[in-house]
């Protein structure tokens, strides 16, 4: 067996998704804690907390207690290498989350036991369904009162359209929480609130008939549990690995992330059943992870991960072959070889140099503006991985500068921050305006904050009469030039130099499309097609 095949089989690359405040970042911390990657988990609840979550590394995230960027973390567990991608729960950063989901092989969905399936969860589930991504579910905050577990499973099946297969089942809830029972092994894990956020090994009884269990949880609760389990085992599906890997069934776990409870069974089950790196589609062929030659694609760019050096890092998912430090790789979009020196692996913002990487791993490449989201790297073959889109923004603002002498820094900041993909930067052909597009208001706050803290620029964003944007293409260059001349007041270029139509109203866009039927107007821009691969 080749080294690439063996190492690929060890990898598990997944993302954690949820509605905001379901406890996703806290659960991320606890998975790292149980995986031995960190010694003490940070509380993300209080702004004044002494510790902050490992995955919420940006200053703004620590102040607000929310995740607005995606973090990448790698740790070993039970002979496997786990690559965990934490994603922003906030709806305004959905595009970042969408692209992260293109870089993983499975997902873990976190649901608040009191709130059930929420709006953001539904949207993320739709994205996962597009790719048939296998999903495990963790129903969180069991230490609080919440919905009836049976009703909750029914809600997940009804609203999300995926079959539930409970693997653990709660014994009580809120103040009456006593533990969970593993339906596959019959083991009972008793609940003990976490102390000092360190790893807790829960007390385990080998079965519901084990001596001493009734004394610990109470005779009546044990009797109620037997009754409930009879009902759930008759009404719900048993775990089927084939259905799970096909994205049609989700194994369900119950627990309390903040109390370290229910995390261990989840992690053990995940390592055993989650898929190793899968094959990937390109515009020309399917790439198998076990191929010996390196391929990979960039799904994220992060500016200023190290405030001391004002760096930009491109996050690349390795799809096949083996990466070695300092190797040259073919950058398909530019048709040039780039030396991938000083590549990094991550624990949120803590980075260390990586000597080698295999399929499923995510590495950071230092980027001086040459690498963009969606770019493919190979060992010479012209390939382009598909499914990494840019979406048309829904909100637009004009950047206004307090100090005109800082214009250069403002342009640099807007360009670099837009490379991350959460916002888009447009320059109208007929004016000197600097237009920023986003899908949510929070993104403008984040950009203003980062411009000030990372680029020393005080900027505000004022409304502008733009309703929507469309990328415009035409195979006939003469026709495109004629369209450009007639519509120059509505045209701009994005940070990649692509032509974009900025429509003041929906009616204006409709008229423009009717008047130029040979011009293609796109609401999304597939990065793969920007490299000229047919």
Curated annotation (Swiss-Prot):
Which residue ranges does the record assign to the tr-type G domain? Answer: 9-278
Transmembrane spans: none
- Protein location: Cytoplasm
Entry-linked Pfam families? EF-G_D2 (PF22042), GTP_EFTU (PF00009), RF3_C (PF16658)
Question: What Gene Ontology terms for biological process does this UniProt record contain?
Answer: regulation of translational termination
| Primary localization | cytoplasm
Q: Which family does it belong to?
A: Belongs to the TRAFAC class translation factor GTPase superfamily. Classic translation factor GTPase family. PrfC subfamily.
> What function does the entry list?
Increases the formation of ribosomal termination complexes and stimulates activities of RF-1 and RF-2. It binds guanine nucleotides and has strong preference for UGA stop codons. It may interact directly with the ribosome. The stimulation of RF-1 and RF-2 is significantly reduced by GTP and GDP, but not by GMP.
Q: What is this protein identified as?
A: Peptide chain release factor 3
Provide the species name.
Xylella fastidiosa (strain Temecula1 / ATCC 700964)
Question: Taxonomic lineage of this organism?
Answer: Bacteria, Pseudomonadati, Pseudomonadota, Gammaproteobacteria, Lysobacterales
